[in-house]
Amino acid sequence: MGKKKNNSSNAAHVLESSVAPILELNFTDPLFTTAAHPTKPLLISGFATGHLYCNSYNGEKLEELEQVNREKAIERQQKAYEAGTITHVNKSVSQLKSKWWTTFNDIKDVPSKGEELVNVQTNWKTKRHKGSCRHAIFDPRTDCLGDYLYTCGTDNIIKKAATETGKVVGKVDVVADYSSAKDKLTKLCHSTTHPFLLSGTEDGHVLVYDSSNLGGTNKIKFKVELAHDDSINHILSMPAVSPYHYLTLGSTTLSHIDIRKGIITQSDDQEDELLAMSYTTDELSENKNDTVLVSHGEGIITIWKNSKNKLADQLTRIKVNKTASIDAIVPTMNNDDENGMASSVWCGDSEGLLHRVNYKRGRVVETRLHSVARGKSDAVDEVGVLDIDYDYRLISAGMDSLKIWSNRYSDDQEEEEEEEEEEEEEEDSVSGTDSGSDEESFSDISSVDFDSENNDDGEELLDKEQWEDVEDEDIPVGTDGSTRNEENKDNTKSEYILPFKRKRRDFSEVITKPKKKLIDINKLTKPSKKEDDGDDNNKSLQEQEKAEEVPQFKKQKVKEKKVTAKQLRNMQKHEHGIRKFEGL
């Protein structure tokens, strides 16, 4: 009996994008890390063997070659379809039998620099570490952007090398700075303004070195002990706050640290492993570090906001793939909002899928397949690393392969996204229901209490349906906590209720106007004898038949109560209520 496909793989094929890679590199040795140069078409690859490769590529030529080969392949399929040899024209990238983009079966097969004029070449390669190469990053400082490369390995050495030649210009052995001799390095992070090189360890410590003087007399500058109870999974700088402030992920918590003073705040236990994090493209372009998106081991993305609760807990969550872990996340770095790129992040999961998540809409809007299992023996290449190259192309990598994806969307893809947005807007306008009300939806809101003074800081992160999710529709509440009813002259302010504290609206409130004509049940009941006599005298047989054919809804008449003598006397004497002053 064959293995049944799960819902996530089926959904991935439905949402699969028509965008294809322009370059694919396969490896015989496990790939542990990769980094893209911020301003040049350079790619660094670090392997479990300790080797380091630097490859350059011509992105424009690869784009043109991929487009030409795609058109030829579709044309061949079209002719075969017209001839009746195939049942349909396949445009799915994951189901192709032959690839139309540039592919190398092994990175060792890439020609070296100067051998021949090709679109991909190896600039240099070296045995950088005795153990595995765990992480590699480029220097992010503006005065030397991408000029230097930093790597760390299981040999407990951090090395600094020139990007152009690969020659080591500085290194430091960190064993003496460990609290335990069995500790190992995991992640690196460099300040965008200062020569601060941070390294995370398996025991949860953060070591800070002077990158301009690696191996000098003053080795370690700062040390933050036990930032987490377990291994450091990610380090993120906060240049908009301070060059000394950073965010770290480890085990099930997120920490805000000052490398001089230690932990500033640490989040609540999320009861799920936090694997990676990134800022939003919007805030990066505006030089802000307030909103953070964190990927989880249970297949979700959570949204955090420093201005709301000092990163004590998540604000909302977005379901991505409940059968896989989200191991990598990166912003699109593209401010072009025509395709929703400015409000999206890329995620890679353990099933080899790539998801573009629009965090403002709270859903996955595009899926690409980095790896597809073919046959029983073929395993899925889990996406462990994501990056963006100098021309905003997505780079996805697992242990077995690396792909650089095209940044050009086809007309069909853009039309499909526009149709989806229009359908969503129509559904919202008709139903008005909350998109997160489904039992399977993960876009619910945390029940953390926040001050109403900060409620304006994160409104853009929540779906517009959630902001409309107000239980009392007759008296809308403004963001300042006061009612918007002009007739209400009471100056007292009603208590402001945040969207994530409100109860979900009852479904009966969604129904506005019935599509079918309502039938008055009183018309269908048997009338009394007196009413029969009156109806026979006043209505003709033709009018009765017409009334039976098209029953009309009428408002029931309320029987007026007669005023008693005592009530009349009290009204005349003004003993109850407010007196009316005549002549004023």
Curated annotation (Swiss-Prot):
InterPro entries documented for this protein: WD40/YVTN_repeat-like_dom_sf (IPR015943), WD40_repeat_dom_sf (IPR036322), WD40_rpt (IPR001680)
Location in or out of the cell: Nucleus, Nucleolus
Domain of life: Eukaryota
Residue segments, region Disordered: 409-497, 516-563
Major location category of this protein: nucleus
Family note: Belongs to the WD repeat WDR55 family.
Protein name per its UniProtKB record: WD repeat-containing protein JIP5
Organism whose genome encodes this protein: Lodderomyces elongisporus (strain ATCC 11503 / CBS 2605 / JCM 1781 / NBRC 1676 / NRRL YB-4239) (Yeast)
Organismal lineage: Eukaryota, Fungi, Dikarya, Ascomycota, Saccharomycotina
